[in-house]
Amino acid sequence: MELRRNGSQPSVRGPADCFTGTVRIDPLFKAPAPARTSGACVTFEPCARSHWHTHPLGQTLIVTAGSGFVQSWGGPVRVIRPGDVVSCPPGEKHWHGAAPTSAMTHLAIQEELSSRVVDWLEPVTDEQYQAVAADESGQPDTGRSSKTCAQP
Protein backbone atom coordinates (compact mmCIF):
# COMPACT_ATOMS: atom_id res chain seq x y z
CA MET A 1 0.00 0.00 0.00
CA GLU A 2 1.19 3.49 -0.79
CA LEU A 3 -0.06 6.74 0.74
CA ARG A 4 0.43 9.95 -1.20
CA ARG A 5 -0.13 13.05 0.90
CA ASN A 6 -2.23 15.86 -0.51
CA GLY A 7 0.11 18.49 -1.96
CA SER A 8 3.07 16.10 -2.18
CA GLN A 9 3.32 16.66 -5.93
CA PRO A 10 3.79 20.14 -7.40
CA SER A 11 0.93 21.92 -9.15
CA VAL A 12 1.42 22.74 -12.81
CA ARG A 13 -0.21 25.32 -15.02
CA GLY A 14 -2.34 23.87 -17.80
CA PRO A 15 -0.33 24.40 -21.01
CA ALA A 16 -1.67 26.84 -23.61
CA ASP A 17 -1.56 24.15 -26.30
CA CYS A 18 -4.17 22.17 -24.32
CA PHE A 19 -6.21 24.82 -22.46
CA THR A 20 -7.64 28.31 -22.91
CA GLY A 21 -7.45 30.54 -19.84
CA THR A 22 -5.98 29.82 -16.43
CA VAL A 23 -5.99 26.16 -15.45
CA ARG A 24 -4.14 24.52 -12.54
CA ILE A 25 -3.43 20.79 -12.52
CA ASP A 26 -2.65 19.08 -9.23
CA PRO A 27 -1.41 15.55 -10.00
CA LEU A 28 -2.88 13.01 -7.60
CA PHE A 29 -1.60 9.62 -8.71
CA LYS A 30 -0.23 7.46 -11.48
CA ALA A 31 -0.66 3.82 -10.63
CA PRO A 32 2.43 1.64 -11.11
CA ALA A 33 2.39 -0.98 -13.88
CA PRO A 34 0.60 -3.15 -14.69
CA ALA A 35 -2.15 -0.71 -13.65
CA ARG A 36 -2.86 2.07 -16.16
CA THR A 37 -4.92 4.57 -14.15
CA SER A 38 -3.92 8.15 -13.36
CA GLY A 39 -5.75 11.02 -11.76
CA ALA A 40 -5.50 14.75 -11.18
CA CYS A 41 -7.44 17.55 -9.55
CA VAL A 42 -7.98 20.22 -12.22
CA THR A 43 -9.16 23.77 -11.47
CA PHE A 44 -10.45 26.04 -14.23
CA GLU A 45 -10.75 29.77 -13.49
CA PRO A 46 -13.89 31.50 -14.87
CA CYS A 47 -14.03 31.17 -18.68
CA ALA A 48 -11.13 28.69 -18.77
CA ARG A 49 -11.62 25.46 -20.69
CA SER A 50 -9.87 22.52 -22.25
CA HIS A 51 -9.32 22.21 -25.96
CA TRP A 52 -11.30 19.57 -27.79
CA HIS A 53 -9.71 16.20 -27.03
CA THR A 54 -10.22 12.44 -26.83
CA HIS A 55 -9.02 9.69 -24.51
CA PRO A 56 -8.06 6.27 -25.91
CA LEU A 57 -9.65 4.47 -22.93
CA GLY A 58 -12.14 7.13 -21.84
CA GLN A 59 -12.20 9.53 -18.91
CA THR A 60 -14.24 10.05 -15.75
CA LEU A 61 -14.73 13.54 -14.31
CA ILE A 62 -16.05 14.11 -10.78
CA VAL A 63 -16.99 17.74 -10.18
CA THR A 64 -15.96 18.90 -6.70
CA ALA A 65 -16.51 22.68 -6.76
CA GLY A 66 -18.00 25.49 -8.82
CA SER A 67 -19.97 25.38 -12.03
CA GLY A 68 -18.93 24.50 -15.54
CA PHE A 69 -19.76 22.99 -18.89
CA VAL A 70 -19.02 19.79 -20.75
CA GLN A 71 -19.83 19.01 -24.38
CA SER A 72 -19.30 16.13 -26.78
CA TRP A 73 -18.69 16.95 -30.45
CA GLY A 74 -22.10 17.55 -32.05
CA GLY A 75 -23.90 17.10 -28.73
CA PRO A 76 -25.66 19.47 -26.35
CA VAL A 77 -23.81 21.53 -23.78
CA ARG A 78 -24.30 20.15 -20.29
CA VAL A 79 -23.96 22.15 -17.10
CA ILE A 80 -21.88 20.43 -14.43
CA ARG A 81 -21.92 21.10 -10.68
CA PRO A 82 -20.42 19.55 -7.53
CA GLY A 83 -21.25 15.87 -7.18
CA ASP A 84 -21.84 15.35 -10.91
CA VAL A 85 -19.94 12.47 -12.53
CA VAL A 86 -19.20 12.64 -16.26
CA SER A 87 -18.19 9.47 -18.12
CA CYS A 88 -16.57 10.08 -21.50
CA PRO A 89 -16.27 6.87 -23.54
CA PRO A 90 -13.08 5.96 -25.40
CA GLY A 91 -12.45 8.15 -28.44
CA GLU A 92 -15.28 10.62 -27.74
CA LYS A 93 -14.29 14.15 -28.80
CA HIS A 94 -15.22 16.53 -25.98
CA TRP A 95 -14.25 19.57 -23.92
CA HIS A 96 -14.91 20.78 -20.38
CA GLY A 97 -14.36 23.98 -18.46
CA ALA A 98 -15.64 26.63 -16.09
CA ALA A 99 -18.68 28.86 -16.39
CA PRO A 100 -18.14 32.56 -17.18
CA THR A 101 -18.61 33.71 -13.57
CA SER A 102 -17.49 30.66 -11.58
CA ALA A 103 -14.35 28.61 -11.28
CA MET A 104 -14.83 24.84 -11.55
CA THR A 105 -12.78 22.01 -10.09
CA HIS A 106 -13.02 18.35 -11.00
CA LEU A 107 -11.13 15.14 -10.44
CA ALA A 108 -10.04 13.63 -13.76
CA ILE A 109 -9.39 9.89 -13.93
CA GLN A 110 -8.21 8.09 -17.05
CA GLU A 111 -6.21 5.09 -18.23
CA GLU A 112 -3.11 4.92 -20.39
CA LEU A 113 -2.96 2.99 -23.66
CA SER A 114 0.35 2.68 -25.51
CA SER A 115 1.83 5.53 -23.41
CA ARG A 116 -1.12 7.85 -24.20
CA VAL A 117 -3.88 9.13 -21.93
CA VAL A 118 -5.15 11.98 -24.12
CA ASP A 119 -5.04 13.22 -27.71
CA TRP A 120 -5.32 17.01 -27.85
CA LEU A 121 -7.15 18.64 -30.75
CA GLU A 122 -8.19 22.18 -31.69
CA PRO A 123 -9.18 24.88 -29.17
CA VAL A 124 -12.79 25.61 -28.30
CA THR A 125 -13.04 29.04 -29.90
CA ASP A 126 -14.24 32.13 -28.03
CA GLU A 127 -17.24 32.13 -30.39
CA GLN A 128 -18.11 28.53 -29.51
CA TYR A 129 -17.72 29.25 -25.81
CA GLN A 130 -19.75 32.49 -25.95
CA ALA A 131 -22.58 30.56 -27.64
CA VAL A 132 -22.54 28.22 -24.65
CA ALA A 133 -22.48 31.12 -22.20
CA ALA A 134 -25.44 32.72 -24.01
CA ASP A 135 -27.58 29.74 -22.91
CA GLU A 136 -27.74 27.97 -26.24
CA SER A 137 -28.67 24.72 -24.46
CA GLY A 138 -31.91 26.18 -23.08
CA GLN A 139 -31.33 24.78 -19.61
CA PRO A 140 -32.77 26.87 -16.76
CA ASP A 141 -30.71 28.22 -13.85
CA THR A 142 -27.37 27.27 -15.33
CA GLY A 143 -25.14 29.88 -13.74
CA ARG A 144 -24.47 31.41 -17.13
CA SER A 145 -24.09 35.11 -17.71
CA SER A 146 -23.41 37.61 -20.43
CA LYS A 147 -19.84 38.06 -19.18
CA THR A 148 -17.42 38.20 -22.09
CA CYS A 149 -14.68 35.59 -21.93
CA ALA A 150 -12.39 36.68 -24.73
CA GLN A 151 -8.90 35.40 -24.03
CA PRO A 152 -5.72 37.38 -24.69
Regions found by a protein language model. Give the residues of each.
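A short, N-terminal "cap"/entry segment at the start of jelly-roll beta-barrel domains
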Residues: 1-37, 117-152
